[in-house]
Design a protein with these regions (language model features):
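Residues that cap or initiate secondary-structure elements
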Residues: 10, 27, 38, 52-54, ...
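Mixed-charge, glycine-accented linear interaction segment located at domain edges/termini
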Residues: 86-121
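Charge-rich, low-complexity N-terminal segments
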Residues: 1-29
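Generic detection of short hydrophobic beta-strand segments and adjacent strand-loop junctions
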Residues: 4, 48, 89-93
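Short polybasic amphipathic segments
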Residues: 19-21, 45-47, 71-73
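Extended Gly/Ser/Thr-rich low-complexity repeat segments
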Residues: 29-40, 82-96
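A short, structured beta-strand/loop element
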Residues: 65-81
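Acidic, aromatic-enriched beta-alpha/helix-loop junctions
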Residues: 29-68
Protein backbone atom coordinates (compact mmCIF):
# COMPACT_ATOMS: atom_id res chain seq x y z
CA UNK A 1 0.00 0.00 0.00
CA UNK A 2 1.18 3.51 -0.80
CA UNK A 3 0.39 5.82 2.11
CA UNK A 4 1.09 9.53 2.46
CA UNK A 5 -0.26 12.69 4.05
CA UNK A 6 -1.04 15.31 1.42
CA UNK A 7 -0.19 18.87 2.34
CA UNK A 8 -0.98 20.42 -1.05
CA UNK A 9 -4.20 20.30 -3.07
CA UNK A 10 -4.74 21.65 -6.55
CA UNK A 11 -7.92 21.40 -8.60
CA UNK A 12 -8.12 22.89 -12.06
CA UNK A 13 -10.23 23.16 -15.18
CA UNK A 14 -7.49 23.68 -17.76
CA UNK A 15 -7.50 25.63 -21.01
CA UNK A 16 -7.29 22.24 -22.74
CA UNK A 17 -10.68 21.40 -21.18
CA UNK A 18 -9.35 18.90 -18.63
CA UNK A 19 -10.35 18.47 -15.01
CA UNK A 20 -7.25 17.94 -12.86
CA UNK A 21 -7.20 16.83 -9.21
CA UNK A 22 -3.74 16.84 -7.63
CA UNK A 23 -2.58 16.00 -4.09
CA UNK A 24 1.03 16.00 -2.96
CA UNK A 25 3.41 15.74 -0.03
CA UNK A 26 7.17 16.20 0.05
CA UNK A 27 7.69 12.59 -1.11
CA UNK A 28 4.58 11.58 -3.09
CA UNK A 29 1.97 12.92 -5.45
CA UNK A 30 -1.32 11.80 -6.96
CA UNK A 31 -2.85 13.29 -10.09
CA UNK A 32 -6.21 12.43 -11.62
CA UNK A 33 -7.26 13.84 -15.02
CA UNK A 34 -10.46 13.66 -17.01
CA UNK A 35 -11.94 15.55 -19.91
CA UNK A 36 -14.29 18.26 -18.63
CA UNK A 37 -17.05 17.10 -20.98
CA UNK A 38 -16.76 13.71 -19.18
CA UNK A 39 -16.37 11.85 -22.49
CA UNK A 40 -13.59 9.30 -22.95
CA UNK A 41 -10.55 10.49 -24.85
CA UNK A 42 -8.33 8.62 -27.28
CA UNK A 43 -6.64 6.56 -24.56
CA UNK A 44 -9.51 6.20 -22.09
CA UNK A 45 -11.62 8.17 -19.64
CA UNK A 46 -9.92 8.79 -16.27
CA UNK A 47 -6.13 9.06 -16.04
CA UNK A 48 -4.43 8.07 -12.78
CA UNK A 49 -0.81 8.85 -11.89
CA UNK A 50 1.05 8.43 -8.60
CA UNK A 51 4.74 9.19 -8.17
CA UNK A 52 5.68 9.05 -11.86
CA UNK A 53 4.56 8.09 -15.33
CA UNK A 54 5.70 4.53 -14.69
CA UNK A 55 2.69 4.27 -12.36
CA UNK A 56 0.10 5.91 -14.58
CA UNK A 57 -2.71 4.68 -16.74
CA UNK A 58 -6.23 5.18 -17.97
CA UNK A 59 -9.29 3.55 -16.44
CA UNK A 60 -7.34 1.64 -13.79
CA UNK A 61 -9.36 2.84 -10.75
CA UNK A 62 -11.69 0.24 -9.27
CA UNK A 63 -12.92 2.41 -6.36
CA UNK A 64 -12.11 5.77 -4.78
CA UNK A 65 -13.47 6.19 -1.26
CA UNK A 66 -13.36 9.68 0.16
CA UNK A 67 -14.04 11.20 3.54
CA UNK A 68 -13.04 14.54 5.05
CA UNK A 69 -9.99 12.79 6.54
CA UNK A 70 -8.63 10.70 3.66
CA UNK A 71 -8.89 9.20 0.20
CA UNK A 72 -8.53 5.48 -0.36
CA UNK A 73 -7.99 4.28 -3.90
CA UNK A 74 -8.10 0.71 -5.14
CA UNK A 75 -6.87 -0.07 -8.62
CA UNK A 76 -8.03 -2.97 -10.75
CA UNK A 77 -4.98 -5.30 -10.77
CA UNK A 78 -5.89 -6.69 -14.20
CA UNK A 79 -5.89 -3.19 -15.73
CA UNK A 80 -2.89 -1.95 -13.73
CA UNK A 81 -0.44 -4.80 -14.29
CA UNK A 82 2.48 -2.43 -14.94
CA UNK A 83 2.00 -0.90 -11.47
CA UNK A 84 4.11 -3.69 -9.93
CA UNK A 85 1.66 -4.44 -7.12
CA UNK A 86 0.99 -0.78 -6.28
CA UNK A 87 -2.78 -1.23 -6.28
CA UNK A 88 -3.83 0.31 -2.94
CA UNK A 89 -3.42 3.95 -1.91
CA UNK A 90 -4.32 5.80 1.29
CA UNK A 91 -3.89 9.57 1.27
CA UNK A 92 -4.50 11.53 4.44
CA UNK A 93 -5.96 14.95 3.70
CA UNK A 94 -3.64 17.20 5.68
CA UNK A 95 -4.86 20.19 3.69
CA UNK A 96 -6.56 23.29 5.08
CA UNK A 97 -9.94 22.16 6.52
CA UNK A 98 -11.61 25.08 4.73
CA UNK A 99 -10.54 23.55 1.37
CA UNK A 100 -11.95 20.07 2.02
CA UNK A 101 -15.62 20.74 1.07
CA UNK A 102 -14.58 22.24 -2.28
CA UNK A 103 -12.23 19.30 -2.92
CA UNK A 104 -15.05 16.82 -2.29
CA UNK A 105 -17.39 18.80 -4.58
CA UNK A 106 -14.72 18.73 -7.28
CA UNK A 107 -14.39 14.94 -6.93
CA UNK A 108 -18.17 14.51 -7.20
CA UNK A 109 -18.13 16.45 -10.47
CA UNK A 110 -14.98 14.67 -11.65
CA UNK A 111 -16.49 11.20 -11.15
CA UNK A 112 -19.98 12.12 -12.44
CA UNK A 113 -21.46 9.36 -14.58
CA UNK A 114 -19.31 6.64 -12.99
CA UNK A 115 -19.79 4.28 -10.06
CA UNK A 116 -16.18 4.68 -8.89
CA UNK A 117 -16.69 7.26 -6.13
CA UNK A 118 -17.88 6.24 -2.66
CA UNK A 119 -18.32 8.92 -0.01
CA UNK A 120 -18.02 8.33 3.72
CA UNK A 121 -18.66 10.79 6.52
Amino acid sequence: MIHFAASTLMTEHTEDNLLVFHLSSDDHYLTLQRRADLKPGRFGDIRFECDGQLWSGYDVIRRLTCSPAQLRISLDPAKAMKFEGRHEYAIELGIDPADKPAALRFLRNFFAGTTLLEEQS
